[in-house]
Structure formats: structure tokens, C-alpha cells
């Protein structure tokens, strides 16, 4: 069913996407009470939303593409107001937890592991929505969220590399067939930073500017991250810095788990001479699970996001199996499966093979695609 702009614009239809704000009180409860409450954040984020997916099912409705930014006001406010909310939660908890005598070391670690689940699952995801906008304020807010998890270069890598080269050998975050997450993760950590740096360097070179020019966003990335480090130290000393770095590490791990899932085994056809077919919905895994899409502001409609990157999350379209490959479960379940390589391959490899047979029956030798050994795109 297609939802009219008038229907989409109603505040009550945006409200389910604000469920992520309910995670912040759980973080506060964990810090105040300690004990078993320190597991609330990962349990709710990973398992409760998975149970909700089973309860509420799929959402295959699509918003009318004629919906304007004014129609999407309430949805936009969710991503904008998350930024100060996360800032206050993160640094407020550093100030409270670092010197807290009622919490032992393991409890403090567990609390900030949970905080990293939030800043990764929600914060980085919201930064992804914000960085794609033309509005300078929204883009700056996206940078602020990434600085809080020490992963600012993700913006450059995502916009300049991933979207341009997805499903080709030049894209570091397209997971290869049979590549486990444990091989994917260290490879991506190394390659993404360098690909982001090289992309910005190339852009400056085209303007006859050196890489040290003040317009290089890496200066801003460094400044924002330094501010976060200094604030963590001012509020919690070296313990505060340690807790800040811990949550950042967890957040980055959460992001790259999602990156691993989104394009696993999917490749664009090499047309020869370093040329590849255009990106289509079939080059990203789609998931229509309603509750986890509330949490992730429709990130699981990833097929449409790559097909039309300028669409805001409320108007991202769902695709059927005829147009895009489908994940069997939402991201919370799939990220858990990704941590277990045998389970992951048992679930996903047959689906990749089905995708290949469906869209590319003419390709009989996939070895170069599996190893990302085809020529780099021009």
C-alpha cells in the first residue's frame, strides 16, 4: 500500500521511530542500580526488538515519493534531537560512572558496553541519515555523532567510496562470499580509513589544493574527536577516557557488523575494461521487519537507499523478492548470526547462490567475484 503525504506527515506515524529514545533511561537505570541492570541495554536492543519483529511482522507499505521535507518534519526532528540527547547521556554517564563507588570495575565496563550498543546501533545510524542531507546543520550534527564514537572518517568513506563503488572490488565494506566477519572486520578497519583519506586527497588534488588545506574535512574530524577526548578526561579523568574509548570501540563493532550484513556476497557484474553495471536494488539485502526498522529508521530498506541515496528514511521504498534479495530476519538477529561463521554461512550462502542464479545465470565462474579479484572500477 502507498501512504499519502498527508498520512505520512502525521506525528503519530513518526512516533514509533522515536522508540530509540527509550534506551536512554535504561542506560541511566544501569548506572544508578548496577547489578543485573547493566545487561539491559544489549538485551533490549538485540533481543527485545527481535521478539517484537516476530510479534508485529513485516511492513511492506511505501510512502508516496511526493512527500516533501515539510511532510517529514517529525521524522527529521527525531534524528536532530537525538544528537543532544546522546551527548548528554554519554558525557553525563562518564561524569557519574567514572568516580562511582557503588559500581565495581566490571559493572562500569558493562554499562559502557551497553552505551556503545546505543551509540553504534542508534547514533551511527542516525549520523548516516544526517550525513546524506544537503542541510549544513544536519551534516554537522552527523559529524558530531561520529566524533562521539571516534569514527569521523566514516562520513568520507561512506559518501565518496562506498556509495560509488559498492559491490565492486574497490569498496572495502562489501563483504565477500565466504569471508567471515572475523576476517572482514580487521580488513575494513585498515582499508576504510585509507580509502577515506585517499578520496579526500583526490578531491583536493582536482582543485589544485594540497592535502593539508583547511578544507580537508579530516581537520574537522580531528578537532571534534579531540574535543570529545578532552571532555571525557575533564569529566572522568583517565577512567572517563577509558570508558569513552570502550563505548566507541563497541559502537564501531556494531557499525561494521551491519556493514558486513548489508552487501554480503552481492556483486555488480563486471562488463569488461574496469566497467561495472549501475547500482540496482538487487545489490543490497532488504529487510521489511517492522520493529527493527523502527529502531534503525528504515536502514534495512537498504536496497532503496543505495538505489536512491538522497531519499530520507521515511520515504525509502520496500522491495519484494522479485527486485531485491531478502534477509530472513532483521538486523538484530542477523548481527548475532554474523558472529557465528558456520551459522552465517548456513543461512546466507544458499541465499547468495539463489541470487546469483536469479540475476546472473550467464556467469558460470564466480571465483574472481568471490576474491574481489576483478579489475578495479575506473
Task: Annotate each language-model stretch with its function.
Residues 104-109, 239-243, 276-287:
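Short, motif-level signal for alpha-helix interfacial/capping segments enriched in acidic residues
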Residues 121-125, 244, 294, 298, ...:
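Short alpha-helical catalytic segment bearing the HExxH-like zincin motif
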Residues 8-56, 73-98, 106-120, 214-257, ...:
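Alpha-helical bilayer-embedded segments of polytopic membrane proteins, i.e.
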Residues 54-68, 267:
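Membrane-helix interface/capping segments
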Residues 64-189:
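Intramembrane catalytic core of multi-pass membrane enzymes that act on lipidic substrates
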Residues 2-19, 23-28, 135-138, 143, ...:
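Cytosolic/stromal cytosol-facing helical appendages immediately following the last transmembrane segment
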Amino acid at each position: 500500500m502507498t501512504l499519502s503525504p498527508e498520512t505520512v506527515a502525521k506525528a503519530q506515524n513518526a512516533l514509533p521511530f522515536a522508540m530509540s529514545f527509550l534506551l536512554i533511561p535504561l542506560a541511566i537505570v544501569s548506572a544508578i542500580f548496577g547489578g543485573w541492570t547493566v545487561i539491559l541495554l544489549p538485551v533490549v536492543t538485540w533481543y527485545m526488538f527481535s521478539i517484537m519483529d516476530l510479534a508485529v511482522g513485516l511492513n511492506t507499505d511505501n510512502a508516496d515519493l511526493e512527500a516533501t521535507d515539510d511532510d517529514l518534519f517529525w521524522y527529521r526532528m527525531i534524528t536532530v534531537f537525538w544528537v543532544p540527547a546522546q551527548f548528554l547521556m554519554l558525557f553525563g554517564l562518564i561524569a557519574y560512572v567514572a568516580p562511582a563507588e557503588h559500581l565495581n570495575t566490571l559493572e562500569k565496563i558493562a554499562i559502557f558496553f551497553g552505551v556503545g550498543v546505543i551509540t553504534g546501533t542508534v547514533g551511527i545510524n542516525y549520523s548516516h541519515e544526517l550525513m546524506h542531507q544537503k542541510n549544513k546543520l544536519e551534516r554537522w550534527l552527523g559529524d558530531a555523532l561520529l566524533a562521539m564514537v571516534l569514527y569521523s572518517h566514516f562520513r568520507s568513506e561512506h559518501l565518496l567510496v562506498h556509495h560509488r563503488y559498492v559491490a565492486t572490488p574497490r569498496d572495502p565494506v562489501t563483504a565477500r562470499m565466504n569471508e567471515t566477519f572475523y576476517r572482514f572486520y580487521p580488513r575494513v578497519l585498515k582499508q576504510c580509513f585509507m580509502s577515506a583519506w585517499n578520496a579526500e586527497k583526490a578531491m583536493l588534488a582536482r582543485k589544485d589544493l594540497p592535502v593539508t588545506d583547511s578544507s580537508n574535512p579530516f581537520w574537522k574530524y580531528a578537532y571534534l574527536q579531540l574535543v570529545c577526548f578532552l571532555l571525557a578526561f575533564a569529566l572522568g579523568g583517565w577512567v572517563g577516557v577509558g570508558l569513552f574509548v570502550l563505548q566507541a570501540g563497541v559502537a564501531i563493532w556494531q557499525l561494521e557488523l551491519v556493514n558486513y550484513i548489508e552487501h554480503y556476497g552481492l556483486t555488480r557484474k563486471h562488463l569488461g575494461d574496469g566497467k561495472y553495471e549501475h547500482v540496482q536494488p538487487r545489490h543490497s539485502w532488504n529487510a521489511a521487519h517492522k520493529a527493527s526498522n523502527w529502531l534503525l529508521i528504515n536502514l534495512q530498506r537498504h536496497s532503496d537507499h543505495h538505489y536512491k541515496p538522497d531519499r530520507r528514511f521515511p520515504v525509502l521504498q520496500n522491495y519484494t523478492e522479485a527486485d531485491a534479495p531478502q534477509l530472513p530476519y532483521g538486523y538484530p538477529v542477523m548481527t548475532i548470526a554474523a558472529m557465528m561463521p558456520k551459522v552465517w554461512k548456513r543461512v546466507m550462502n544458499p541465499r547468495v547462490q539463489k541470487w546469483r542464479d536469479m540475476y546472473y545465470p550467464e556467469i558460470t565462474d564466480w571465483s574472481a567475484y568471490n576474491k574481489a579479484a576483478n579489475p578495479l572500477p575506473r
